[in-house]
Amino acid sequence: MAQKVILGAEDIRRTLARIAHEILERNQSSRDLVIIGMYTRGVPLANRLAENILRFEGLEIPVGTLDFSLYRDDLDSQRFHPTIKNTDIPFSINNKIVVLVDDVLFTGRSTRAAMDALIDYGRPKAIQLAVLVDRGHRELPVRADYIGKNIPSARDEKIKVRLTETDGQDEVLILDDEAGEV
């Protein structure tokens, strides 16, 4: 079972601080800014970004959560049986700049599904994508606005993000095709 740690806890902390600064630099009018985390690991990442922005600028940015599982294009797959989670967007996204947050950007299909789900909640001024890891292999024309780390990988390798809130520790691993789930 071959696995390699790509980012440790301190790397993730620094990376999220950098992304928060990039979000602030790009969005001077931060009163129009909201952050929405994609289930599962995008949710704690969204909360951490909002905490960083609060610490750096004293700005409290609204944070929501988005379950996009019913918008996926593989619902008819024999292998996929979604666990429905609670979408919680307790604010209007109309005319807001929505920063959509996910842990890994791979084919772009989850991002497409999340954008479809998000549009059911209103008409944002803009949608920006923040990801901890971009591993390439796009199948759809999707790119992230904020990238923690580009990790070129083989298609059969897996990127595993572990976060304290969901997994008890912070790290990003790359697993070969024989390593399976950790």
UniProtKB/Swiss-Prot annotation:
Belongs to the purine/pyrimidine phosphoribosyltransferase family. PyrR subfamily. PANTHER family: BIFUNCTIONAL PROTEIN PYRR (PTHR11608:SF0). It is an enzyme of class 2 (transferase). Its EC number is 2.4.2.9. Regulates the transcription of the pyrimidine nucleotide (pyr) operon in response to exogenous pyrimidines. This is Bifunctional protein PyrR. Disulfide bonds: none annotated. It catalyses: UMP + diphosphate = 5-phospho-alpha-D-ribose 1-diphosphate + uracil. GO terms for biological process: regulation of DNA-templated transcription. A motif (PRPP-binding) lies at residues 98-110.
